[in-house]
């Protein structure tokens, strides 16, 4: 039996009268890389924000690593966020802290990690994302691509079981996209469970085990990259892909 790490059943989410997720069913196996694609407003980012507890949902069930998501239980939510890392399109680094301190902060606060251990881990993670020499730099001294790589290192510092990436290259200049995608690809190669909302279709095709196409708040198609990109089954996916190439 596959080792399911994220299990989503019948998930529904409303903002007022607007239902943005209309019954999502999705199981994610440990080590799996899933790309979530679709037009703006299809519910992609909202789904990620539900998985790590940033958004509450009205109906359905969601478990991560065997633990049910319980919005009313603050302790359970803190534990969930230690299992689920999230990287946003805006890097959200603390501007007054050095790069190293940005990476060290959450483990120190949440896990009470000793400063010496935290520094060693931060240096190791910055080396992993190709920024070993930037430990003492300030965020405003970095390019957007470098800041996003620091944000990846910061998320990894909490040793998450699942990493959520929400359009993490969409705010970058085109020439900086590749350096961030190479880091994400290396995480996939190392067996990290990844769910990524992306507009980088070539990257999704190359790195993903499965691609999820969302349309109007539902999972409209799901399958291997070869199947979805090479043989789309619905008019909506065909139109979405043709618009990208048009």
Where are these regions (language model features)?
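C-terminal boundary and immediately downstream tail of ABC-type ATPase nucleotide-binding domains
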Residues: 215-216, 222, 226-246
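ABC family nucleotide-binding domain
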Residues: 3-225
């Amino acid at each position: 039996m596959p080792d399911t790490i994220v299990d989503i059943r019948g998930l529904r989410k409303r903002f007022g009268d607007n239902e943005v997720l209309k019954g999502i069913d999705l199981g994610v196996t440990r080590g799996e890389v899933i790309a979530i694609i679709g037009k703006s407003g299809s519910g992609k980012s909202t789904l990620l924000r539900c998985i790590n507890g940033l958004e509450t949902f009205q109906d359905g069930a969601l478990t991560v690593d065997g633990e049910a998501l319980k919005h009313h239980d603050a302790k359970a939510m803190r534990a969930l966020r230690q299992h689920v890392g999230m990287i946003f399109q805006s890097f959200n680094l603390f501007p007054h802290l050095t790069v190293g301190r940005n990476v060290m902060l959450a483990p120190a606060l949440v896990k009470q990690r000793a400063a010496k251990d935290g520094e060693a881990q931060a240096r190791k993670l910055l080396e992993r994302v190709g920024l070993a020499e930037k430990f003492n730099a300030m965020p405003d001294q970095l390019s957007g691509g470098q800041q996003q790589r620091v944000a990846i290192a910061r998320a990894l510092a909490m040793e998450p079981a699942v990493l959520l990436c929400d359009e993490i290259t969409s705010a970058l200049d085109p020439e900086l996209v590749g350096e961030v995608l190479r880091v994400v690809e290396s995480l996939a190669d190392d067996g990290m469970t990844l769910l990524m909302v992306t507009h980088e279709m070539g990257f999704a095709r190359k790195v993903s085990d499965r691609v999820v196409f969302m349309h109007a708040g539902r999972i409209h198609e799901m399958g291997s990259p070869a199947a979805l990109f090479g043989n789309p089954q619905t008019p909506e996916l065909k139109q979405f892909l043709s618009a990208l190439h048009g």
